[in-house]
Amino acid sequence: TPLKRSLRRALRRQKMSALLLIAPLLIFILITFIAPIADMLFRSVENEIVQDTLPRTTAILETWDSESGNVPDTPVFKALYQDIFIAQERKLHTRLGSRLNYELTGASSLFRKSGRGVGDIGEVYQDQFEDMNAFWKKGENWNDILGSDAWLAEIKSWKKASGQAQPPFEIRAQIAEILPQTAAFYQIFADFTQNEKNSNLYKKDPWELIYSAFYDDLTGANAARIDTYTGPGAAELSEAKAAAANFETVDYKAAFGDIDKDWLKMPIWDTIRAYSPRFTNGYFLNAVDMQKSENGPELRPENQRIYATLFLRTLFMSTVITLSCILLGYPVGWILANLPARTANLLMILVLLPFW
């Protein structure tokens, strides 16, 4: 009936008015209370740093049989070299080391030391290419080969003083096909140089990592396709391909062993493998003196169990303080309730005085 419809509309308006009145308070509570708690709870299980910093290493580690008792093979160490090299350029390897140090004592110093040592690994190939032909020393020559014609035209006319953004690097299509690893890592190098360092890519000499990838392409499955390339630097590419067959190679596993013997031991690899997923219960396990392992959660060694002891001590002191307050508070409260008002007020002042 019209009366009922009118009543429903009136009630609806009344509810909306009440909701609007409390809306600012609800929003305030959501922003200042609920959201921080939700963020804290998310951070307690979030663990993206391992996979984001070591993407190639963690991908290959998925197929590693940790129960064999042997550290991973050379392909994993090669991926580790590539990941740590990029991470140390971006100053991320120390953050990862600090994160893993919560789980394995010594991981922080291990990653710092490795960040300083990976440059020497790539220099093995860099020195050989540059000794063979000085052409490979200059960043301009690398860009002439790897960059597209359109990008080269733009970057050569670009001036930093112009205030305009640097034209983003574009790989030459044919090079991406015949030198896939070099192209992939050079793209990372280009993004870092242009966006994070804000430097002129055309004049920047490549990372040592680029030379390692370049060697892999020259001696890999696509090596025969290099002879079909006719663009800039074709003669130098053919020369490099012929020379690379006789280059000194890098044993990545031995190289990391030279940096630190801990890379040839199981604990660091078990830790990386256990904490490679993007979400983890590791923080909660640590809080109760447990740790992740290949066999699931397990107690930490006895000399590392500190949180349970701290919790029991805290619980004991809380109980003692609570009982003391009850034993002191109830008699004082009873006395104050039964004394004359003047005397009770004086005693109340004496009770409150220590708090002031």
Identify the role of each PLM range.
Residues 19-20, 36-38:
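Extended assembly-interface/linker segments at domain junctions
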Residues 24-28, 32-35, 325-328, 350-356:
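Faces of alpha-helical transmembrane segments in polytopic inner-membrane proteins
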